[in-house]
Amino acid sequence: MSPSLSRRSALQAAGATVLAAGFTQLSATAARADEAAVVTPKLVTYPRPSAMPTNTSFKVRVRTAPDGEWQTLDIWRPQLGEINPTTGSSKTYNSSLAYFDFQGSVEVEVTCLKGGTTKVRVRPDSYGIKPEVGGDTLRFTLDQPRNVVVQINDDIFDCLHLFARAVEKKKPAQDDPNVLYYGPGVHTTADGTLLVPSGKTVYLDGGAVLKATVIFRNVEHAGIAGRGVLAGTAGGGALVENSRNISIGAVTVLNPNGYAVQLGEATGVTIKGLGSFSSKGWGDGIDVFCSSNVVIDGVFMRNSDDCIAIYTHRWEYYGDTSNVTVRNSTLWADVAHPINVGTHGNSDNPEVLKNLTFKNLDILDHREPQMGYQGCIALNPGDSNLIKNVKVDGVRVEDFRWGQLIHMRVMYNTKYNTSVGRGIQDVYVKDLSYTGKPLATCLLLGYDAKHAIKDVTFENLVVNGTVIADSMKKPTWYLTTDTIPMHANEHVLNLKFLTTAEAVAAS
């Protein structure tokens, strides 16, 4: 270790860590002094079973601040995908993942073992983490749970994903009759599935790997908890069908052969703290079909298809989808959409997707060459679906590779649909911001006068620092949409762009 990394000064009054000479001013968030006085620092790390593949691009150490003992984290190997837009072939990349739990304040040290570090970025950018850098080693401090990506020299695949979670409040006893306990090590089942009865919790302890799809079918009051991993499953990670009051906690789904989580005709489902990585075709994150009262909170999704997809009828699922909230989460779509709503439905007995909320999200990337499948946020009703009462609040979008910021289209995609969607109504987008290269044109497209987009309001839409509003300064003959840029066709009715002050005055 270089001398500059072996010396440090005491915590400042605000709790920020300052490293010695050779580093620039540390601005990563640190514990406030008053909190440090009452919170006992704690750090929990977990082993990676030797049978699970690792990656050798990074070394990661962590310690309680200011002067705890350094602990080296085991590195896991998630795999990521990228589609060649000329051939349609998919390339798979090995990446890195480490995770731990903590309370109080911790210092994280990451060393890029490949060398040659010239640029470092810790994402999401909204966290404001500016690490101290010395050679190929960087340090930063955390005082609250964060899921971050450490990116070296703009490499978005051979990067480090770091899950810094809160310490579990209560771990079940291994012999609890209501717990299906899996301890550290690799576990399998006879047929690659695990059927969970009502009232039971599957507990994957840290360091546990379960190679089975966890299935909740016609059950209630059941769930998954712990800090373990669902890896290499023959199907998806978890399947919830015709069930109610199901919880899925802060486990990690690595490289499944399907969706990380699939909900069908489920109600009262909470997914909190889940991490997910995929590289294969149809590698969606969380797909919701014909379900209600769903909360997705604090998840990190990096997927090779839609990160979050919300639909009505498909396969044997029937009924409306309502009251779905996605919040406090980070989404990265290597293929398709971070958020996609409305494609699949029931042309014979039309259904509704309503009361959908997307709040406090960081969208780190979106890459989709196909125009019909673009949009960091996409509302695309087909199959006679009606989408209504959608709220987007506090979504930050970083520079993405390929696609559109917003895409709303009442569609009849004959590849997937048997009828045109009925429409989109009552969408309120507040505090959506984008920072990056100039945007490709966003599309808002009603299908015809009977299948229109109605009553869409943007409040405080910010594109590269410019607030987009109907009252903004622009040539009088320009449309507000020209400044984004966005195209809204003649079947988009009552489209508004407001400043925050204008929205408050109108309320």
Sequence positions of predicted segments:
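C-terminal segment of N-terminal export signals and the immediately downstream linker at the start
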Residues: 3, 25-36
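Extracellular beta-strand-rich solenoid/capping regions of secreted or surface-exposed proteins
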Residues: 98-100, 138-142, 187-201, 209-225, ...
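Extracellular beta-rich repeat passengers
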Residues: 368-507
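Low-complexity, Pro/Ser/Thr- and charge-rich linker/hinge segments at domain boundaries
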Residues: 164-186
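Beta-strand-enriched, solvent-exposed domains that form extended recognition/catalytic surfaces
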Residues: 37-172
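Right-handed parallel beta-helix
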Residues: 199-201, 206, 220-230, 244-255, ...
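N-terminal export signals
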Residues: 9-30
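Short glycine/acidic-rich loop motifs that flank beta-strands on beta-rich extracellular proteins
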Residues: 190-192, 211-215, 232-237, 256-263, ...
